[in-house]
Amino acid sequence: MAENQANAAADEAAEPIVGHVTRIQGSVIDVEFPVGHMPDIYNALTVEIKQMGQQEEGEVKDSVITLEVEQHLGDSTARCVALKSTDGLVRGAIVHDTGGPIEVPVGDVTKGHVFDVSGHILNKKPGEKIVIKERWPIHRNPPAFDQLESKTQMFETGIKVIDLLTPYVQGGKIGLFGGAGVGKTVLIQEMIQRVAQNHGGVSVFAGVGERTREGNDLIGEMDEAGVLEKTALVFGQMDEQPGTRLRVPLTALTMAEYFRDVQNQDVLLFIDNIFRFTQAGSEVSTLLGRMPSAVGYQPNLADEMGSLQERITSTRGHSITSLQAIYVPADDYTDPAPATTFAHLDATTELSRDIASRGIYPAVDPLASTSRILDPRYVGQAHYDCANRVKAILQRNKELQDIIALIGIDELGEEDKTTVNRARKIEQFLGQNFYVAEKFTGVPGSYVPAEETIEAFTRICDGVYDNVPEQAFSGIGGIEDLEKKWHKMQKEYGD
């Protein structure tokens, strides 16, 4: 008898749990399950809907929608969020519990491919055979405390303004803050190219709630540059459901974790845009009927952000370095979305509309950008001293701008005149030509090692280039480019 009960229990466990749709409100679906068979929170559910095909064929196509369980209501009802459009879904539709969270492909199969939030390949070529050997759930715990890597090391980018004033941490989290149109996405595209060319690591890109055109352009540019084969891309763009946009970063992060933990590789994770992740969370929270918090954001904003950011870290010997574009609504840095992100970052690169309007790119604000490793213990005394001298000159120039506007630069003392002239040269020299902008500007991109950057700015601060005009410092790479441009200008215009 005991054996029969065991067999019955095994048969019952083997049978998939089936529920029925009881309520549909936009992308929020209520599903009723048999008593005692409620799926866990974050479990993936699937439901088939019938869609009519082309009229002349009259065929019926089946479409599968994935739902994610977000809440348990009374009466054995689960409230779920749909990850696809619910067009065609009706009450009474049969829903199957998959028995676990959304699982996505991991490993080498992800390189060179574009995925959606559920791990479906979007750029499969005709006749291409893809064998997926392993899948991981997107909801995972962060590494245990004793597995974390305590070593702090600078990640060299070859971009002068970043390496000098806001050095990035290998295995750290970096935020690119800025309003609309100041160059966040371009800087991320440039970093992807530089990592592939100079570091040879694996990159994972998450496109969260951004323009579909930008995603298409990015894929094309990466393919042309030959870096697509070392990159996995996951997209949930502007036209996707809020549930999709909320989970896309987790899908990309899961792929990155496999490269770090199983293949023992250093990984770069790019997220564009983390604000859209917060925005999607706000939409889902409202749809689920939660009381909004400050400025209409979800009450669990800090918890949602923390659950994502705490998984982006270094374990012993291997790292995930994350570069996150963060849109700042109306250039307001006190907005809860960017303000919540600040607490998790190791370095912040703030992009300025004023600097962009002067044609200096990347339009990084050197005084507002920060890094926790701009410290002699991590970058060395020479780097630290040079960065502080550059900031002091730029700060003094900023203070003098009101006086210059009133009485003119000629009325300043000699020391202040020298400071202003050096500051203008520094501002121009902090700009740099990018590889990804080469086809627009016609100027080749440049990689400047950190040592050369420190040497060049130390010379400017020491007055070595006081006789070189400001125009010679714009749109160039290192010292060699500066001297070439200066000699060319001398030949064209005379000594």
Curated annotation (Swiss-Prot):
Root EC class: translocase
Residues that hold ATP according to the record: G178, G179, A180, G181, V182, G183, K184, T185
Compartment(s): Cell membrane
Keywords recorded for this protein, A-Z: ATP synthesis, ATP-binding, Cell membrane, CF(1), Hydrogen ion transport, Ion transport, Membrane, Nucleotide-binding, Translocase, Transport
EC number in record: 7.1.2.2
Recorded topology in the membrane: Peripheral membrane protein
Primary location: membrane
Catalytic activity: ATP + H2O + 4 H(+)(in) = ADP + phosphate + 5 H(+)(out)
A cellular component annotation (GO) from this entry: proton-transporting ATP synthase complex
GO MF entries: ATP binding; ATP hydrolysis activity; proton-transporting ATP synthase activity, rotational mechanism
Family affiliation: Belongs to the ATPase alpha/beta chains family.
Subunit relationships: F-type ATPases have 2 components, CF(1) - the catalytic core - and CF(0) - the membrane proton channel. CF(1) has five subunits: alpha(3), beta(3), gamma(1), delta(1), epsilon(1). CF(0) has three main subunits: a(1), b(2) and c(9-12). The alpha and beta chains form an alternating ring which encloses part of the gamma chain. CF(1) is attached to CF(0) by a central stalk formed by the gamma and epsilon chains, while a peripheral stalk is formed by the delta and b chains.
Biological role stated in the UniProt entry: Produces ATP from ADP in the presence of a proton gradient across the membrane. The catalytic sites are hosted primarily by the beta subunits.
Protein name listed in UniProt: ATP synthase subunit beta
Source species of the chain: Bifidobacterium animalis subsp. lactis (strain AD011)
Encoding gene (name): atpD
